[in-house]
């Protein structure tokens, strides 16, 4: 979202930097991310201090990145005193998307992310985003406890409470995502989850998880199974839209769940009425509409 800050948090070695580079490639060329998600072509700036230029170059070669080099710039050394310089660069170069990797390395030289100073840095970034219209995506780490496994050895799913450091950090972002390795496919390919934890922008449903497949050879990601969950998301959005229109156009009439279910189900004239919508899905989306109404 333009003029806002989003954060992606994950354990070390999960692939945050690779995901950033893959998004950068898609945005600078205007190509769909994962060959599925539309992007807006624009200038991108990456502030990278979580890995060296040499290591990054090796990763780019392995990923076979093909960005539009005229639309991407990098910064490999950073100090919080460079905030004003960053703002001027964004304006001068018409940068619309800025990646920062990672928050702890960029703003936590002292190693203490639990102070109010972390909140000050978030305030400063938000100020730059608001003044320039640039969208920021900041990579961050999870607390060390996140590495612990449950008794059944299943990976722990990130929550906002797992974000490392002060609550001021999470409070200062508009949207937040948690990323983790969910397991492996039958062929040993690593599988990842990307969960929408903070939804102030309302991009998709809160706590929705994209399913990503990873390639150990290329270190690239792709949407896994039913377009990474996009097919189910599209179906749910379609149900929600139909319910909203039906209720709005029939106000103040009252409907039962069964009546709403029948009304939005597909009709096949040659074989009678056939439902393509599970009634449980209707109930779930109705609860979502009630929650949305309560928030407004």
Regions found by a protein language model. Give the residues of each.
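Phosphate-binding/switch region of NTP-binding enzymes
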Residues: 7-8, 13, 17-18, 45-47, ...
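Flexible, glycine- and charge-enriched loops at secondary-structure boundaries
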Residues: 17, 76, 111-118, 166, ...
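Short, glycine/charged-enriched secondary-structure capping and boundary segments
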Residues: 22-23, 59-62, 112-115, 151-159
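Short helix/loop segment immediately N-terminal to the Walker
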Residues: 33-39, 145-155, 271-276
């Amino acid at each position: 979202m333009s003029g806002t800050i989003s954060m992606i948090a994950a354990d070390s070695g999960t692939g945050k930097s690779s995901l950033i580079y893959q998004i950068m490639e898609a945005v600078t060329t205007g190509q769909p991310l994962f060959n599925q998600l539309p992007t807006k072509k624009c200038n991108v700036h990456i502030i990278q201090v979580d890995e060296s230029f040499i290591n990054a170059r090796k990763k780019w070669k392995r990923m076979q990145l093909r960005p539009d080099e005229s639309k991407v710039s990098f910064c490999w050394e950073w100090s919080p005193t460079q905030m004003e310089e960053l703002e001027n660069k964004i304006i001068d170069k018409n940068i619309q998307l800025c990646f920062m990797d990672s928050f702890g390395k960029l703003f936590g030289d002292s190693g203490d992310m639990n102070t109010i100073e972390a909140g000050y840095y978030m305030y400063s970034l938000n100020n730059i985003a608001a003044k320039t219209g640039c969208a920021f995506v900041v990579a961050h780490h999870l607390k060390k406890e996140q590495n612990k496994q449950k008794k059944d050895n299943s990976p722990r799913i990130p929550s906002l409470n797992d974000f490392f450091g002060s609550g001021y950090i999470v409070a200062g972002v508009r949207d937040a995502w948690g990323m983790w390795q969910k397991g492996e496919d039958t062929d040993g390919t690593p599988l990842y989850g990307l969960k929408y934890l903070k939804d102030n922008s309302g991009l998709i449903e809160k706590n929705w998880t994209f399913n990503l497949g990873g390639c150990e050879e290329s270190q690239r990601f792709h949407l896994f199974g039913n377009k990474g969950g996009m097919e189910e998301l599209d179906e749910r959005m379609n149900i929600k839209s139909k319910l909203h229109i039906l209720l709005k156009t029939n106000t103040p009439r009252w409907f039962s769940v069964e009546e709403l279910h029948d009304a939005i189900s597909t009709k096949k004239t040659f074989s009678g009425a056939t439902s393509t919508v599970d009634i449980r899905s209707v109930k779930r989306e109705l609860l979502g509409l009630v929650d949305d109404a309560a928030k407004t």
